[in-house]
A protein has these predicted regions:
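A glycosyltransferase accessory/donor-loop signature
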Residues: 93-178
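The conserved acidic donor/metal-binding loop of glycosyltransferases
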Residues: 11-15
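Conserved catalytic core of nucleotide-sugar-dependent glycosyltransferases
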Residues: 17-110
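Active-site nucleotide-sugar/metal-binding loop of Leloir-type enzymes
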Residues: 1-6
Length: 178
């Protein structure tokens, strides 16, 4: 694994509050967790976007394969592969994600939960087509988001955040450690 082979993806509204190994046994990690707040709508939307190729139909299977993380490594090659399989171009995929961002903030999208998780779509794709090349880790990856941050009033100095990101001295420490 090299750093240039992967995108490091983190949600924009996340405050780093815990360390996660993004690599295990020389393979990128796909995180999965179950959460009562998770909605089947993610799956329905992904199923529509991929013509049913990445669909999960039973609740039991959904719980066992519920991929989501606030930060994760996306392999560039697999991202290109996935976009090429389900979309005509990168531009079409970007338009799709922009429209998704717009729709998710509308009242009817909130009501019907018609939006997509890039983490779930990517993870379902990798699990289906590259399962032997990843490590699947069942863990609670949730970080403190902007709403929890304001409630908890936990703050990090710029220096502390910089140290968390850059620390490569200690095994397993540092958010960007490969």
């Amino acid at each position: 694994m090299t750093k240039t082979d992967y995108y490091y993806v983190i949600d924009a509204d996340i405050m780093p509050t815990k360390e996660l190994r993004l690599e295990q046994n020389g393979k990128p990690v796909l995180f999965t967790r179950t959460n009562p707040m998770d909605e089947m709508a993610f799956n329905r939307f992904i199923a529509k976007a991929t013509g049913g190729d990445l669909a999960i139909w039973s609740d039991e299977e959904y719980v066992e394969t519920r991929f989501i993380a606030d930060q994760q490594l996306f392999k560039r090659e697999w991202v290109d592969e996935m976009i090429g399989k389900y979309f005509h171009s990168v531009e079409e995929f970007m338009l799709f994600t922009c429209l998704n961002t717009y729709w998710r903030n509308t009242p009817w999208a909130r009501r019907d939960s018609i939006f997509i998780s890039e983490y779930i779509m990517y993870s379902l794709y990798v699990k289906k087509y590259h399962k032997e090349e990843v490590e699947i880790v069942y863990a609670d990856t949730r970080q403190i988001d902007k709403n929890q941050y304001s409630q908890n009033q936990q703050t990090f100095s710029d220096e502390e955040i910089s140290n968390m990101v850059k620390d490569t001295e200690n095994e397993g420490r540092g958010f960007l450690k490969l």
